[in-house]
């Protein structure tokens, strides 16, 4: 499980909470508190889906894009399908980013 993420230079803590603690949603993002909450007990795939979904919310808020929930959902599903259909893609992107001079 991931406990910390950096989104556009801002560090977020990631908390995993029970269904009792997070009853109405699978995840939530609190930009001002630098916090992402994920409901525990999901399958690994669903947990990854929720984490990516909340990261897109964090990007949306940082860029002030004002995405709708549907746009965030569709972007999440699209990226997950892209990664599933192209399993070498994440490794390739990561290797290119690691070698890039900033």
What are these regions (language model features)?
Residues 49-61:
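Active-site recognition of the HExxH zinc-binding catalytic motif
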Residues 1-46, 62-102:
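Metalloprotease/metallohydrolase-associated module, dominated by Zn2+-dependent proteases
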């Amino acid at each position: 499980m991931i406990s910390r993420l950096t989104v556009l230079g801002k560090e977020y803590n990631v908390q995993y909470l029970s269904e009792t603690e997070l009853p109405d949603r699978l995840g939530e993002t609190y930009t001002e508190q630098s916090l992402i909450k994920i409901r525990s007990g999901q399958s690994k795939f669903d947990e990854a889906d929720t984490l990516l979904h909340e990261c897109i919310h964090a990007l949306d808020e940082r860029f002030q894009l004002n995405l709708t929930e549907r746009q965030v959902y569709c972007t999440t599903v699209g990226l997950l399908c892209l990664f599933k259909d192209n399993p070498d893609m994440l490794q390739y992107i990561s290797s290119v980013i690691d070698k890039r001079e900033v």
